[in-house]
């Protein structure tokens, strides 16, 4: 009955060509197929095991008016979709009926979970008529899979949603963190499936009245939503360099960060210089180390953004990187005004 994998992510967008070009030409996704009906037009993109559906049209209009471009659906692969729906609804999820042949339940804000049969293969999202596309323009693919989804929630609701994902979909609590930086703060809980294929980082501002980045996100987004999608790569320095050349804007990291990093990684001087050149952040956990960098949001409301992440043994999220990434977003927000 538990959710086992993420089958696809669906974005609702106002400018589909711009959104598809960003994912395809800049981030390296391949345009696989398209589908259209009276209510919408969708493009399916794929890279590694990650499928992204970009949808525009009347189906998306209400979502876009309220929230702007963003993630509308995180589809779960389940061993038994009927039992999964019953469990989720029993734990408090809103039953949204059957859409395109699959049960759908509500979650946080406007985001839904379509429930589909789990599969060892990457399958086309069901219930639509897909027409294959030939995409000769996709650059070298660096992304292997979706590492985690960061979800921004309202202050005071973090425990509620951590319990919800535990009870409704069988995810387990993995870790928690609290960050306080210059008067703004972030509370977080990580929940993860037993398969390790679903990881949600639930984040919320420490106070509903603060002026930090999470409250700013909630205001621009019209409530809770997906803050970022983290994309796992094998070589983040190459991935960032190539994506930058193709027009992806990444957050900047101050030089002083790398001076301190040299003390924490005394045997990695060559690596640190490569990280400095690409603004990539580094941290350790008890299993290894991880490298991360955030993009700027490519969407009109400056809400959803992306992360590139490389894991060299690390399974969790280093405390130093959580703080450094939070500070990077906060700096960028203050500079942008």
Language-model features: where?
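Hydrophobic, ordered structural segments
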Residues: 67-140, 150-152, 298-300, 305, ...
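C-terminal functional regions that serve as terminal interaction/effector modules
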Residues: 13, 228-238, 242-251, 257-337
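Vicinal oxygen chelate
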Residues: 4-14, 62-85, 103-106, 144-155, ...
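Active-site-adjacent "gating/activation" loops or surface patches in catalytic cores
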Residues: 130, 195-212
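ER-lumen resident redox/N-glycosylation machinery signature
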Residues: 30, 58-65, 116-119, 140, ...
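N-terminal beta-strand motif that seeds the catalytic metal site of vicinal oxygen chelate
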Residues: 1-17, 71-76, 123-162, 224-231, ...
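Short loop/beta submotifs within extracellular cysteine-rich repeat domains
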Residues: 52-53, 199-200, 210, 301, ...
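Core segments of cupin and vicinal oxygen chelate
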Residues: 1-52, 90, 96, 101-107, ...
């Amino acid at each position: 009955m538990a959710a086992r994998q993420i089958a696809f992510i669906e974005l609702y967008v106002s400018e589909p060509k711009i959104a598809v070009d960003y994912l395809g030409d800049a981030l390296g996704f391949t345009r696989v197929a398209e589908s259209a009906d009276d209510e919408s037009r969708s493009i399916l993109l794929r890279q590694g095991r990650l499928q992204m559906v970009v949808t525009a049209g009347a189906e998306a209009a209400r979502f876009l008016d309220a929230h702007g471009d963003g993630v509308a659906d995180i589809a779960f692969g389940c061993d038994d979709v009927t039992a999964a729906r019953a469990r989720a609804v029993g734990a408090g999820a809103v039953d949204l009926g059957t859409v395109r042949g699959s049960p759908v339940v509500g979650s946080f804000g406007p985001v839904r979970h379509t429930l589909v049969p789990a599969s060892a293969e990457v399958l086309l999202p069901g219930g639509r008529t897909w027409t294959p596309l030939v995409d000769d323009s996709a650059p070298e693919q660096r992304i292997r899979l979706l590492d985690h989804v960061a979800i921004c929630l309202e202050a005071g609701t973090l425990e509620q949603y951590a319990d919800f994902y535990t009870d409704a979909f069988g995810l387990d609590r993995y870790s928690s963190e609290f960050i306080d930086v210059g008067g703004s703060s972030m509370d977080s809980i990580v929940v993860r499936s037993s398969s390790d294929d679903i990881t949600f980082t639930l984040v919320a501002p420490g106070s509903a009245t603060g002026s930090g980045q999470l409250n700013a996100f909630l205001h621009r987004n019209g409530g809770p939503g997906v803050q970022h999608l983290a994309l796992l790569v094998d070589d983040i320095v190459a991935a960032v360099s190539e994506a930058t050349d193709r027009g992806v804007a990444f957050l900047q990291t101050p030089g002083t960060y790398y001076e301190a990093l040299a003390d924490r990684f005394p045997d990695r001087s060559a690596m640190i210089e490569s990280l400095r050149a690409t603004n990539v952040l580094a941290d350790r956990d008890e299993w290894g180390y991880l490298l991360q960098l955030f993009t700027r949001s490519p969407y009109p409301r400056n809400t959803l953004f992306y992360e590139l992440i490389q894991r060299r043994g690390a399974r969790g999220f280093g405390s130093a990187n959580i703080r450094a990434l939070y500070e990077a977003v906060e700096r960028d927000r203050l500079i942008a005004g």
